[in-house]
Regions:
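Flexible, compositionally biased loop and terminal segments
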Residues: 1-276
Length: 276
């Protein structure tokens, strides 16, 4: 899978040896929104033939992971990128606060149940990366994950990064192509979107005081993101940090990265069975 990933040309890919001193802050979107919509539509059409070959050949699985702060546009990006694709082999899993049952397992267990079969595209709306983001910002959440005392955070985070790297390397070796997207929204645009939710009756249900409280931890989240990117972006499972202030630009970029990745896979239709 490393050769496939190497074929993707994106300014947003985080190299393995990035050594980021701070989180990426590429907020500007240079394209016109109408132009981005048109390019998104063209890109979705270009993905369809690869999707059919993926499903028919069942040689590879695709795992797309979306992580972001609140109001960055994960839901919209997932909806728009996959809108015109055949739903037969696309499955979206949204991971919320862990249940009591999930907390009785290791932190990779609940997402492992939703991994793609060969021929399938699995989309994770949040993922096990919450365990090195939200939980790192709020380490008191660790108490619910352990029967006894929670591990020392200074030793826990390196152990979790290592577990994630080994998990993703195993998946890649077994034929899963992994693409991870950090949707990078600016504080100002995030605040504006919170206000927009209050103004729009169709979006008001999305508004949460909890989201407002979380936004006050922005500096802590930026630090956690920096560590996450540095520790877990690898050739077989790279991170793409995409500007999220412009929704249509974001969606087009995600679709184009997916298109490039699928185009680089050696997808083939299976040979028909011989007649007796």
């Amino acid at each position: 899978m490393e050769g496939v990933i190497g074929a993707i040309h994106s300014p947003w890919m985080v190299p393995e040896d990035a050594g980021l001193a701070e989180p990426p802050r590429n907020y500007a979107a240079p394209e016109d929104a109408g132009d981005c919509k048109r390019k998104l539509e063209e890109t979705r059409k270009a993905i369809r033939p690869y999707q059919r070959k993926l499903y028919a050949g069942r040689q590879f699985g695709l795992l797309l992971i979306f992580q972001a702060l609140d109001a960055a546009g994960k839901d919209g990006a997932i909806r728009e990128v996959f809108e015109d694709l055949d739903p037969v082999n696309v499955r979206v899993s949204a991971f919320k606060r862990p249940t009591k049952r999930e907390l009785r397992h290791d932190f990779l267990w609940r997402t492992s149940r939703e991994l793609p079969e060969r021929g399938e595209i699995s989309v994770f709306n949040r993922s096990y990366y919450e365990e090195v983001l939200t939980v790192r910002v709020h380490p008191q959440n660790l108490q619910a994950q352990y029967a006894g005392d929670a591990p020392d955070p200074e030793s826990l985070w390196p152990a979790r990064y290592r577990a994630i790297r080994e998990h993703e390397r195993h998946l890649a070796t077994a034929g899963t192509l992994i693409l991870k997207f950090w949707l990078n929204v600016s504080p100002g645009r995030q605040a504006q979107r919170f206000l927009d939710r209050l103004d729009d009756p169709a979006k008001r249900w999305k508004f949460s005081l909890g989201d407002i409280r979380e936004s006050t931890f922005r500096t802590d989240y930026d630090e956690a993101v920096r560590h996450m990117l540095n520790e877990t972006s690898r050739p077989w499972a790279p991170w793409f940090c995409i500007p999220a202030d412009d929704r249509w630009y974001l969606r087009w970029q995600v679709a184009d990265i997916l298109r490039q990745a699928m185009a680089a896979l050696p997808l083939e239709y299976p040979e028909p069975d011989e007649l007796p």
